[in-house]
Amino acid sequence: MFIDTEASGLPKKWNVPYSQDDNWPHIVQLSWLICTKDGKEVKRQDYYINNNDFKSAASAIQIHGITEEFRQRRGKDRSTVMSILAADLLQYSPLIVGHFTELDLHMIGADFYRSGMENPALELPSFCTMMATTHYVRNPQMKYVRLGELYSTLFHRKLENQHNALADAKATADCFFELLKNGDITDAKIERQQAEMVKVKAEIKSAGYGIPVLIVFLLTV
């Protein structure tokens, strides 16, 4: 599964519980692709969230271009979207891949919390193309390479429609399979990164404590 989120802003702190709602931004667009191991796309999902319990920061809208009017008109209820994501996580038990996966895992973790749902992603392996491609960094002032820069390096063309979650999820998938093909990603490297993600998932589990227990979602696939 290749996943990307566009959000209402950035976290103020990374080590506080999701119950501190004003600390954690809200997802405004959530997209993911399900692919086979050889890169064949099985399905894609793309949703905007229209709940009125938050507003995006002007700086965030400037980046992703998702206005309040647009998401209210085009979006779905948060719980509906998170239920669809949870169903796919449970059905496919995928490797979850993102570019800056830590942020995406926190974003879906916070919105699972807001929806009163358990977070199936915490029980699944994950991989971050940003963490795996530090050797592609050309700017000595940068620690990681941005998705658009990685894409243009690998494919010698500009990534179009950046900061649209579906476009970025597809670009992450393209980069992952290209990196797999050229040997920059191997099964061993994916396995080694799981140890690095243990701390991230522990923080997410800690942040998500206190999920309301009276709300029970039955997901049948």
Task: For the regions a language model picked out, list residue spans one by one.
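Entry/capping segment at the start of metal-dependent catalytic domains
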Residues: 1-40
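Metal-dependent phosphoesterase core characteristic of DEDDh/y 3'-5' exonuclease domains
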Residues: 24-66, 87-212, 217
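Metal-dependent phosphoesterase signature
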Residues: 61-84
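Interfaces that engage single-stranded nucleic acids at replication/repair/recombination sites
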Residues: 221
